[in-house]
């Protein structure tokens, strides 16, 4: 399975999630909920950028040598870019899944965010 197919399988199961390729960015893919990005990537999905709570973002950057704050000042808001390369192992894809599912509720409307948080056992 290609990296894009894997990422789509993770992101597009979330409520009202869509993939939008940004023409002005040479077709760079994004995943959105109601026009708000929760994942940025490249066409080959060799890296992903996700929004995390600031403390978690700082911890990921401090402990993962393939992670860095996302550029354009987005890192200050908790966005992290992580290299996943081609042929990432299952542990890395599990991390990507967790990060995408963490990013989504941070940008989604509360009613949609709650659905994911409930699925993940994070709210009653």
Model region roles, listed by residue range:
Residues 1-124:
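Charge-dense, helix-prone N-terminal extensions
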């Amino acid at each position: 399975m290609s990296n894009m197919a894997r990422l789509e399988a993770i992101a597009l199961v979330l409520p009202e999630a869509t993939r939008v390729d940004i023409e002005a960015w040479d077709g760079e893919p994004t995943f959105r909920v109601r026009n708000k990005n929760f994942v940025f990537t490249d066409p080959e999905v060799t890296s992903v950028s996700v929004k995390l709570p600031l403390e978690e973002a700082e911890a990921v950057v401090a402990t993962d040598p393939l992670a860095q704050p996302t550029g354009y000042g987005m890192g200050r808001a908790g966005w992290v870019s992580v290299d996943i390369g081609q042929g990432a192992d299952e542990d890395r894809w599990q991390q990507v899944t967790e990060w995408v599912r963490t990013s989504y509720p941070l940008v989604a409307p509360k009613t949609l965010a709650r659905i994911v948080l409930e699925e993940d056992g994070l709210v009653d």
